[in-house]
């Protein structure tokens, strides 16, 4: 019986799952909107919600816990400096999942997971900065 089993295994080891969700959470925090499979989006939501709640707390221990979870200092910096201030008045529900049809190759249900009140310019900002830096070096 599956009683009390909250999370899916995704046919991965525990370490692989932890790394996968750290990468997905980092991508979501960086871009504020990502497209992934529906089951991954549903399992990613509580991970990100807990990280934003940690960031709202804002103390040193919370920052270290977020670093241990995400393993990327730039993502943690954005989480604590930008997102924590944006959601300080909201008691939860920082993300939304929007169903986006089915993937062409294998008909897997796909979803968009994004932050509520997201910054629209955040998606692709790193790519634009990288392209501008490459143009500056080339010129």
UniProtKB/Swiss-Prot annotation:
One of its GO terms (molecular function) is structural constituent of ribosome. One of its GO terms (biological process) is translation. The keyword Ribonucleoprotein applies. The keyword Ribosomal protein applies. One of its GO terms (cellular component) is cytosolic large ribosomal subunit. SUPFAM superfamilies: Prokaryotic ribosomal protein L17. Keywords: Ribonucleoprotein, Ribosomal protein. InterPro entries: Ribosomal_bL17 (IPR000456), Ribosomal_bL17_CS (IPR047859), Ribosomal_bL17_sf (IPR036373). PANTHER family: LARGE RIBOSOMAL SUBUNIT PROTEIN BL17M, RIBOSOMAL PROTEIN L17. Belongs to the bacterial ribosomal protein bL17 family. Part of the 50S ribosomal subunit. Contacts protein L32. This is Large ribosomal subunit protein bL17. It comes from Azorhizobium caulinodans (strain ATCC 43989 / DSM 5975 / JCM 20966 / LMG 6465 / NBRC 14845 / NCIMB 13405 / ORS 571).
């Amino acid at each position: 019986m599956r009683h009390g089993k909250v999370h899916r295994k995704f046919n991965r080891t525990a370490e692989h799952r932890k790394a996968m969700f750290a990468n997905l959470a980092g991508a979501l925090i960086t871009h504020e909107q990502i497209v992934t499979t529906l089951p991954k989006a549903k399992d990613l939501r509580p991970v990100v919600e807990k990280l934003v709640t940690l960031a709202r707390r804002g103390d040193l221990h919370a920052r270290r816990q977020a670093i241990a979870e995400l393993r990327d200092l730039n993502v943690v910096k954005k989480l604590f400096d930008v997102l924590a201030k944006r959601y300080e008045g909201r008691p939860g529900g920082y993300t939304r999942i929007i169903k986006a049809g089915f993937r062409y190759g294998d008909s897997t249900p796909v979803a968009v997971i994004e932050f509520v009140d997201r910054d629209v310019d955040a998606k692709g900002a790193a790519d634009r900065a990288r392209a501008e830096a490459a143009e500056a070096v080339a010129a």
